[in-house]
C-alpha cells in the first residue's frame, strides 16, 4: 500500500496503523510551492510516499547507473569473523559486486507538472507512478487507486502492463483545465482511452 501525503497528514497516516507502516519514500517534486509564505517558512518541494504492508511485498528495485562499485576490502580487528554472522540476517557470505548499477535510494526525483498545465493540484507525474508500479508490482498485477483524480496511476498501470481499478467521486475544479466541471471518473476514463 502506497499513500501520498505531507506534514500532519503523513504523521496521522503513519500512526493510524503503526504495525503496517514500514518506511517512507521522499518524492522530490523539483518545482517548489508555497511562495506566498516564503518569508514565513521554507518553500516546499517534496511529498512523502508512505509504504505499508503486512508481509514483504513484491520489490523490484529500479537500478540506476552510477560510478563503478569499489571493493569492500578485508575486515580487520579481533572480531573479523563476526562479519559473516549477523544477528539480524544470520550467516552470510561476502560477495564481490562489480559494475556500475546502484540500488535506488529513498529519494525519488520526478518533476511535477507546472501549475499552468496541471489538470489537478494533486496530480502525480505519470513517470513517478510508472516507477512505483514497476518497483512494487509484477506485470499482470492489479493496481488500485481509490482516489484516482485525473487518472495518472491507472494510465501508468496500463502503460506498464498491469490491470487497474480507479475510482473517484470528485469533480475537476481547475478552471483553467479543459476538464473543468467534469467528474474525475469521466476525466480518467477519457484520458485512459487516449493511451495506446
Write out the residue ranges for each language-model feature.
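Short Fe-S-cluster ligation motifs
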Residues: 196
Amino acid at each position: 500500500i502506497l499513500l501520498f501525503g505531507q506534514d500532519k497528514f503523513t504523521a496521522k497516516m503513519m500512526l493510524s496503523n503503526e504495525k503496517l507502516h514500514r518506511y517512507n519514500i521522499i518524492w522530490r517534486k523539483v518545482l517548489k510551492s508555497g511562495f506566498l509564505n516564503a518569508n514565513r517558512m521554507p518553500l516546499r518541494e517534496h511529498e512523502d510516499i508512505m509504504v505499508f504492508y503486512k508481509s514483504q511485498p513484491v520489490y523490484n528495485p529500479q537500478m540506476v547507473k552510477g560510478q563503478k562499485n569499489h571493493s569492500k576490502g578485508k575486515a580487520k580487528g579481533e572480531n573479523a569473523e563476526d562479519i559473516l554472522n549477523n544477528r539480524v540476517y544470520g550467516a552470510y557470505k561476502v560477495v564481490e559486486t562489480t559494475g556500475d548499477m546502484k540500488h535506488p535510494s529513498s529519494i525519488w526525483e520526478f518533476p511535477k507538472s507546472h501549475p499552468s498545465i496541471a489538470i489537478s493540484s494533486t496530480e502525480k507525474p505519470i513517470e513517478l507512478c510508472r516507477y512505483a508500479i514497476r518497483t512494487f508490482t509484477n506485470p499482470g498485477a492489479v493496481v488500485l487507486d481509490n482516489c484516482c483524480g485525473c487518472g495518472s496511476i491507472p494510465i501508468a498501470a496500463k502503460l506498464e502492463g498491469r490491470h487497474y481499478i480507479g475510482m473517484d467521486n470528485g469533480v475537476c475544479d481547475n478552471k483553467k483545465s479543459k476538464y473543468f466541471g467534469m467528474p474525475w471518473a469521466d476525466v480518467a476514463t477519457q484520458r485512459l482511452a487516449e493511451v495506446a
